[in-house]
Regions:
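Structural alpha-helical scaffold elements that stabilize or flank donor/cofactor-binding regions
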Residues: 8, 138-140, 190-193
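Active-site metal-binding loops of divalent metal-dependent hydrolases
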Residues: 13-14, 151, 273
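Conserved phosphate/ATP/ADP-binding segment of small-molecule kinases
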Residues: 163, 168-173, 180-254
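Glycine-rich phosphate/adenosyl-contacting loop at the front of the ribokinase-like
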Residues: 1-75, 87, 332-335
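A glycine-rich helix N-cap at a beta->alpha junction
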Residues: 92-109
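Structural detector of well-ordered beta-strand residues that form the stable sheet scaffold
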Residues: 9, 75, 147, 174-175, ...
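Conserved phosphate-binding/catalytic region of the ribokinase-like
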Residues: 1-9, 28, 214-335
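Conserved phosphate-binding/catalytic loop of the ribokinase/pfkB sugar-kinase fold
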Residues: 101-105, 114-157
């Protein structure tokens, strides 16, 4: 694929997720922090129902599979360990039509392995990213889109290299969906990435943290404007069951969720499917209102099964859901 133009080049860590289904637990609210905690009995043996292992996941691998199923020519830049888990990840990517040309096998390292405590329809993830030596690949032809998401804490020089590449190739459009460690690095550290982004995705809580209003109540219109003022051309902010919002400097749009056909099984990957579908829609020539109408459909489908990729839709199936949408499933202009 090196001499062919890639539509969608995803960059980010690949992981194996082990879903541990637990039932002997409860959720309690931390009144001071306003957060919720998963509580299990301390110092005891806790029974679990079963374990389901899912390979080749993580924000960017999920996005690459999503884009591939929607019909884009897709590749993934990532590292795997020198182990059977890494080999299985490669097999999954190939089965999904994602080019593995830029996947590096790191000698002496393990493949990232996460443990997912799966309780009811939510998950708490125990994460560990290997400190791989990151390097940007030699691309003979610039891709149409780069999709950047979760990388480990030691990846700051890598982010700088990605920023330099996008600066040198202004025809390349960058989507940035920050992962946990990228959020921790903060705006100032990753200012170049924010300012070079064509598309930026986060949720309401993350947006408030980025703009320095973490503990304040804000109108969504103001939050959209402040987030876009950081540099991205198009900002998309999700708000859980309330839906999602987008702003391109001129028009603000609100989109409700696509109704679930049955209660969600597992919410892992809902954000990845949303962001990658929105990006893919733009890459396929769709407008912003059309893109924000596509995205929740794939998220709805993903949460109906275990893992972040099982429910990802083909373009044909997504458009079938769209044609059968409820009357009120329409983007609404809010400015």
């Amino acid at each position: 694929m090196s001499d062919e133009q890639i539509d969608f080049l995803a960059i980010g860590d690949i992981v194996v997720d082990a879903f541990i289904r637990i039932e002997d637990a409860k959720v309690e609210k931390d009144k001071e922090k306003g957060t919720f905690n998963l509580c299990i009995s301390f110092g005891n043996k806790i029974p679990y129902k079963y374990v389901e292992v899912v390979y080749a996941v993580g924000n960017s691998p999920n996005a690459s599979v999503s884009a591939s199923r929607l019909g884009l020519k897709t590749a993934l830049v990532t590292s795997i360990g020198d182990d059977p888990e890494g080999e299985r990840c490669l097999e999954v990517l190939k089965e999904e039509g994602v080019s593995t040309e830029f996947v590096t096998r790191q000698r002496g390292f393990q493949t990232n392995y996460h443990y997912v405590l799966w309780y009811e329809d939510e998950r708490t993830i125990l994460v560990k990213h290997q400190d791989y030596p990151y390097s940007f690949p030699n691309l003979e032809t610039p891709p149409k889109w780069i999709y950047l998401s979760s990388l480990s804490e030691n990846s700051l020089p890598y982010h700088n290299a990605i920023a330099e590449y996008v600066k040198a190739n202004p025809e390349v459009k960058l989507t940035f969906q920050p992962g946990t460690f990228q959020m921790g690095l903060g705006y100032e550290t990753l200012k170049d990435i924010y300012q070079l982004s064509e598309l930026f995705f986060c949720n309401v809580e993350e947006a408030k943290e980025i703009v320095g209003k973490k503990h304040e109540k804000m109108e969504i219109n103001d939050l959209l404007k402040m987030t876009r003022d950081l540099g991205p051309k198009i900002v998309v902010i999700t708000d859980g069951p309330k839906g999602a919002y987008t702003y391109d400097g001129e028009e603000m749009w609100y989109m409700p969720l696509y109704p679930d056909p049955k209660p969600p099984v597992d919410r892992t990957g809902a954000g990845d499917s949303f962001a990658s579908t929105f990006t893919s829609a733009l890459a396929l020539g769709k407008s912003i209102p059309e893109a924000i109408q596509w995205a929740p459909i794939n998220s709805m489908s993903v949460v109906q099964g275990v893992g972040a990729q099982k429910g990802l839709l083909s373009r044909e199936k997504l458009e079938e859901y769209l044609s059968n949408r409820p009357d009120d499933y329409e983007p609404r202009k809010i400015n």
